[in-house]
Every structure is written in structure tokens, then in C-alpha cells.
A protein has these predicted regions:
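Helix-loop boundary and gating motifs at the non-cytosolic
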Residues: 1-39, 207-212, 217-237
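Hydrophobic core of transmembrane alpha-helices in multi-pass small-molecule transporters
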Residues: 3, 73, 83-101, 214, ...
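Helix-to-loop junctions at the C-terminal end of transmembrane segments
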Residues: 44-58, 145, 263-276, 364
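C-terminal ends and interior cores of transmembrane alpha-helices
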Residues: 68-81, 286-299
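Cytoplasmic helix-loop-helix junction between adjacent transmembrane helices
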Residues: 93-129
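A membrane-interface helix-boundary motif in multi-pass transporters
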Residues: 143-163, 362-380
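Juxtamembrane intracellular "pre-TM" segments in multi-pass secondary transporters
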Residues: 177-210
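Single conserved hydrophobic/aromatic residue that forms the stacking wall/gate
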Residues: 409-418
Length: 418
């Protein structure tokens, strides 16, 4: 299940930008809008589907329904070449895909509970197969040709994703049943959607943290949207036309996912040694390097910089998401802890990704390559400097006990706002 769950996403998330820009000649702002759809969906769809799974439809069945609908819209999207209908179909597909990340986790947890297995111990090795699936799908669309053209450069990547969606939709109905609580105590929509946790903005430190979560969240989708397209642009230069990096750019970009998986193992040590604030600062500086190396790199003598950009991605993404989630865990009361985690995700993967994707597209249209990468790097550096000055936090190593387990649990989070 986890393999298919993320293979569906890996089939198009990294390569769609190159198809939109190179195959359909969309502008940077238009390309950014496609990746902003994930921000729109993250604002409310996971919560709505979570309510439905809790109250009315078992999670495994709802998982199948969502994947079927998402796959249907992917097929519709694949047949479109004009911006408006293609965007509309992708938005609707993403609206039904994003909730499946949380639903698949719930289904997995339920299956482990039924088998009387410890979720902390047994779930991470299962979830790793999601990353394997994501990378495998990236390699497939990069290495497979239809009509002499790589799938990653055509609408066929959406057909591949749709096929995988239908396979998982069918398989979901065979998974162990998840309970529903039809007689659960009624709550207001404010409580059900976790909106009461927004009261945390009244606390200065939490408000500062959430604002910076949004500011850094703006960086999450930039390389997903434009990384492959940028590398493909080198193919128009005679000296790089036959470069393996250009021809297999998605395989190069898959190093980012490999780095992400490995960097998770470093987080417990860094959190205990340096504390949350410094770890978050390391993440922000890693984003500076991520973008800067992209700007310096090229498929020739600068290939090493492109590889370094992939390697630092794991630090940039993991160190912020997991340390940020831990900060929320420590600073909030048990009654609103889950809702507060939801606010953190909304600020990063919702508002941050939405505004960041559109802003990045506008920058690309205005300044082109490689200047845009240096602008993104400068933005990340400014955010890091201001965060270091404004955010007040005193590290207490004793509070970091149990971090190892927490970091492993967060492998299950929707990490591809990568």
C-alpha cells in the first residue's frame, strides 16, 4: 500500500514542471499554480476526509474512493493541453489525493493494531516503502520511452499515475476494516476541524514560529516545480545536449529523496546536541545551499554542485519539518496538540506552499535562470537571519529524551512538499 501510495505521486510531482514548461510552453506563474494546488488542498481536504472516515465511511474504503476519483481526474488532465482545463483537472485530482496520505497512515496503524504490533517499532520500516515507491516511479518515467520520447516529458506520466491510482483504489477495499464512530459525541465544526488551535497565535512565541513556518514553507515546492524544467533547459545548449544529467534529470533529482531518508537518522543526534532553534536554522541555511548550488551548477563542470544540491535537500526538508513538529509537540497542551500539529501543516504545506509556488513562478518569469535560484537563496538567507534574531528559545537537552521515536514516527508525514 505505501509503495503504491507514493509511487502515484512520484510519477508526476518532480517531472510535471518540465512537461508544462517544455511540452506545453506554460509560463513560470502558470507552472507555479499547479504546485499551489497542493497548498489549496492541504488547507481543508485532509480534515474533511478525516471527519468522514471517523464518522461515516471506513478509512480503507474512503481511501479507495479518493484514489479512484483522483485517478479519473488525472486521466481527464492528461488529455488537456490548454491551461484552464488542465489546471482544473489537476486541482480536482490533488484535492482527492492529498487526504489519502493521512488516510493511508490511519489504515496502516489500524492494521498494525489488529495484529497487536507496536506502531512506533513496525511502522517506520513499512513507511520507508513509500519512499522506495516514490523513487521507483521517478526512475520509471525517466527511463521509459513511448514513441521514442521519455514519459517524463509527456502527458503519459499522468496516465501512469492514474493507473497506479486505480490499482491502489481496488486494493484498498481488501485491506483490514477500520472502525467508524457513528455515535461519537457531537462537536462543533470549530473543534472538529481543529480551528481552536489557532488561538495559539495569541502567544507571541508560537505566533512567530507559525509565521516563519509559513515563510519557510514557501520554499518547499520550488525545486519540485522548477528543478527538472531548469535542468532540461540545458539541453538546448549544444555542449550539454547529450549530457546524461539532462537526459536523466529525474534520476538525478531522486537523490533528494534518498538524502531525505538518510537525514532522518541524523535528527535525534542534532536535536539533542544543538536544540530545536539551531536545527531549524541549519535547515534554513541548507535551503540557501539547495538553491545556491542549483544556480551555480550545470551538467558539465558544475555537475558536482547539482549533486550537492540534492544531498543538502534532506537536511533542508527534514530538519525543519521534524524539529518544527517537535516544537509544537512540546509547547502545546494535550487537548489541542493534534490540532496544533494541523495548524503547523496548514501554515507550511497550505499557506506557505500556495503563496510560495505562485511567487516563485512570478520570479522565474521576471528574472529567468539562473538568477531566480540566487533570489530564492537570498530569500532563504533573509528568513534565516530574521528567525535567528526574532525567535527566542533556550535549549534544554533533558527535554530531548524520546526524540528518536518521534523522528521515526514523522517518516509517516506527507513529506513531498519536497
Amino acid at each position: 500500500m505505501n509503495f503504491l501510495q507514493y509511487a502515484i505521486w512520484g510519477s508526476w510531482l518532480i517531472s510535471l514542471g518540465a512537461y508544462l514548461g517544455g511540452g506545453l510552453d506554460f509560463s513560470g506563474l502558470q507552472i507555479g499554480s499547479f504546485f499551489a494546488t497542493m497548498g489549496i488542498a492541504s488547507l481543508f481536504m485532509p480534515a474533511v476526509m478525516g471527519i468522514i472516515a471517523d464518522r461515516w465511511i471506513p478509512a480503507q474504503k474512503l481511501l479507495g474512493i479518493c484514489h479512484f476519483i483522483s485517478g479519473a481526474f488525472l486521466i481527464a488532465a492528461a488529455s488537456q493541453t490548454a491551461y484552464a482545463p488542465l489546471y482544473s483537472c489537476m486541482l480536482l485530482s490533488v484535492m482527492f489525493y492529498m487526504p489519502t496520505i493521512a488516510l493511508s497512515n490511519s489504515v496502516a496503524y489500524n492494521a498494525l493494531d489488529l495484529a497487536r504490533l507496536d506502531t512506533v517499532k513496525h511502522f517506520p520500516p513499512i513507511r520507508v516503502w513509500g519512499t522506495v515507491g516514490f523513487i521507483a516511479a521517478m526512475w520509471f518515467v525517466d527511463l521509459t520511452h513511448i514513441g521514442g520520447v521519455q514519459i517524463k516529458l509527456t502527458e503519459w506520466q499522468l496516465y501512469v499515475s492514474a493507473l497506479l491510482s486505480f490499482v491502489l483504489a481496488d486494493y484498498s477495499f481488501s485491506l483490514p476494516g477500520c472502525p467508524v464512530e457513528r455515535s461519537a459525541q457531537k462537536q462543533s465544526w470549530v473543534d472538529t476541524l481543529g480551528l481552536r488551535a489557532f488561538a495559539l497565535f495569541k502567544e507571541k512565541r508560537m505566533a512567530i514560529f507559525f509565521v516563519f513556518s509559513m515563510l519557510l514553507g514557501a520554499a518547499l515546492q520550488i525545486t519540485n516545480a522548477f528543478g527538472d524544467s531548469y535542468i532540461q533547459n540545458f539541453g538546448s545548449m549544444p555542449q550539454y545536449a547529450d549530457s546524461a544529467i539532462v537526459k536523466h534529470s529525474v534520476i538525478l533529482l531522486s537523490l533528494s529523496q534518498m538524502s531525505e531518508t538518510l537525514c532522518i537518522l541524523l535528527i535525534p543526534f542534532f536535536l539533542r546536541r544543538f536544540g530545536i532553534k539551531k536545527v531549524m536554522l541549519i535547515s534554513m541555511l541548507a535551503w540557501v545551499l539547495r538553491f545556491g548550488f542549483f544556480g551555480i551548477g550545470d551538467p558539465g563542470s558544475g555537475a558536482a554542485f547539482l549533486v550537492l544540491s540534492m544531498i543538502v535537500y534532506g537536511v533542508a526538508f527534514d530538519f525543519f519539518n521534524i524539529s518544527g513538529s517537535l516544537f509544537v509537540e512540546k509547547e502545546t497542551s494535550r487537548e489541542i496538540r493534534s490540532s496544533a500539529q494541523g495548524v503547523f501543516m496548514i501554515m507550511t504545506n497550505g499557506f506557505g506552499a500556495f503563496f510560495g509556488s505562485y511567487a516563485a513562478g512570478a520570479v522565474v518569469d521576471a528574472y529567468g535562470w539562473p538568477d531566480s535560484w540566487f533570489i530564492f537563496a537570498g530569500y532563504a538567507l533573509v528568513v534565516a537571519v530574521v528567525f535567528a534574531v526574532v525567535f527566542k528559545y533556550r535549549h534544554n537537552p533533558a527535554e530531548m529524551e524520546g526524540v528518536k521515536h518521534l523522528s521515526l514516527i514523522h517518516i509517516s508525514e506527507p513529506t513531498r512538499l519536497q
